[in-house]
Amino acid sequence: MAVRLRLAHTADLEPAELRRARALLDAAFDGDFSAEDWDHGLGGIHVLLQDGAGLAAHGSVVMRRIRHRGRWLRTGYVEAVAVRADARRTGLGGRVMAELERVIDRAYDLGALAASDEGALLYAARGWQRWGGQVHALSPDGVVRLPEAEGGVWLRPGLAGPLDPARELVFDWREGDVT
């Protein structure tokens, strides 16, 4: 069965498409995909892969700002990547990531994401690099360190060039998980 790819901004998705994407994510994360997690994946570009059984895979890239060495980098942040259970290990996750990476490479200074141990295998195989330095956020109370995020942030160097792990990353603030 042929798999159809659709690339669209959140604003161009029909309500039914958004509901199907949310249902896929809820199922893929065993109900551990919160309203804040969903919100983090909106407002950017979505990759949707459809097969004969419906929505098989999804991922999105949204704009964030990350400061490094005093410069705020326009960052394509990967969110909400999932593959339907019966379609896993068929290359669909790689197809989603290839499209997201194409968007990142053409439109952003840097790509970034936070990965689970299981997801990290996919990202490492695709050339993403685990960030070895400190992670901070610009919170309402000022810059705060996020030691729990360290080791879980992955980067795709782009137009910004290589980053120095001796210097911290400072993420813009958002509700819920900052990274």
Where are these regions (language model features)?
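Conserved N-terminal entry element of GNAT/NAT acetyltransferase domains
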Residues: 1-15, 168-178
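Conserved GNAT acetyl-CoA-binding A-motif
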Residues: 102-116
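Conserved catalytic-core motifs of GNAT/GCN5-like acyltransferases
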Residues: 129-155
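A short, internal acetyl-CoA/4′-phosphopantetheine-binding micro-motif in the GNAT/acyltransferase core
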Residues: 78-88, 118
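Conserved beta-strand-loop-alpha-helix junction that forms the acyl-donor binding cleft
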Residues: 112-122, 137
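Conserved acetyl-CoA pyrophosphate-binding loop and the N-cap/start of the following alpha-helix
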Residues: 86-99
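Conserved active-site tyrosine of GNAT-family acetyltransferases
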Residues: 21, 123-124, 128
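A conserved beta-strand-loop-helix scaffold within acyl/acetyltransferase catalytic domains
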Residues: 7-82
